[in-house]
């Protein structure tokens, strides 16, 4: 697997991964602390913590792809998708009770993740794109669902 860094986004991706790797050497792993906080939280706060955990997994996956560890990166993308699904389920249950706490913050984070995954998909080799493209589609679809939770169905708005 080789990454192509001819594009501007590729260079920024490499710089971001290098910076993240340098910071990771200094700081302890935040994932267990985030997971514990998410397990203890409820509602919108739980969803926000879960989506931060998903973003952390996507960052780790990006680093793995840069270091040409494709299997590890694909596994981390799968974990990110699971955290995002749990966050959405939490928000969906909350919305059933008429509450929308945290939906906007989660949607913003999901948009950032989705854009980062689209950049990563452009930079990895064709044979390694499948897990990245799948994760990018998952997060794009999740964002659409979150927007639907926030604003309701656009089709129904036109009928009113």
Please provide the spans of the model-predicted regions:
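Enrichment for repetitive, rod-forming helical segments
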Residues: 15-18, 53
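Long, charged/polar, soluble alpha-helical segments
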Residues: 24-160
């Amino acid at each position: 697997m080789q990454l192509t860094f001819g594009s501007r986004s590729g260079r920024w991706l490499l710089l971001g991964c290098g910076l993240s790797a340098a910071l990771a050497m200094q700081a302890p792993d935040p994932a267990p602390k985030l997971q514990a906080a998410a397990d203890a939280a409820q509602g919108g706060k739980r969803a926000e913590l879960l989506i931060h955990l998903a973003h952390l997994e996507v960052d780790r996956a990006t680093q793995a792809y840069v270091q040409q560890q494709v299997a590890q990166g694909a596994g981390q993308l799968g974990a990110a998708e699971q955290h995002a699904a749990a966050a959405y389920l939490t928000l969906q249950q909350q919305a059933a009770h008429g509450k929308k706490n945290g939906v906007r913050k989660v949607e913003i984070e999901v948009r950032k993740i989705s854009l980062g995954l689209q950049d990563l998909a452009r930079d990895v080799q064709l044979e390694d794109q499948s897990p990245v493209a799948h994760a990018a589609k998952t997060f794009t679809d999740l964002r659409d669902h979150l927007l639907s939770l926030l604003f309701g169905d656009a089709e129904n708005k036109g009928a009113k």
